[in-house]
A protein has these predicted regions:
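Membrane-cytosol interface motif
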Residues: 1-8
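Membrane-proximal, non-transmembrane interaction modules
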Residues: 8-115
């Protein structure tokens, strides 16, 4: 999965450890939004967090807990990116995004027998 590889790259950059929370959460948000757009087929990178939140309410395959966690991460990213809220050390949200991606990605069913 491309998004998971991008999260690994972001982690290795160590932006949060270098004190660049703004850039870290900007990149994290972009990775997550691209994934959401690809997975649920809407232009998430171009939408506001509020628009994405409204869209989530109409997605039948997205569990409430995953929806709430996704919105929490997007809001936190917005606060750090735009309001310059300080990020807590050690709370990079990469693992939270990784878990959401892993729990919401489509699983392909492979048949062992030709039909």
């Amino acid at each position: 999965e491309k998004a998971l590889r991008e999260l690994d790259i972001l982690k290795r950059k160590g932006l949060l450890d270098q004190g660049d929370a703004h850039q870290h959460f900007f990149e994290l948000s972009e990775i997550f939004r691209r994934y959401l757009g690809w997975r649920y087929r809407f232009p998430a990178p171009d939408w506001t967090t509020e628009e994405i939140t409204v869209k989530f309410s109409s997605l039948p395959g997205l569990e409430t807990q995953a929806r709430e966690e996704a919105v929490r991460i997007l809001i936190k990213s917005d606060l750090i990116k735009f309001a310059r809220v300080e990020a807590a050390p050690g709370h990079d949200e990469i693992e939270s995004v990784r878990k959401l991606i892993e729990s919401t990605r489509e699983h392909k069913v492979i048949s062992l027998y030709a039909e």
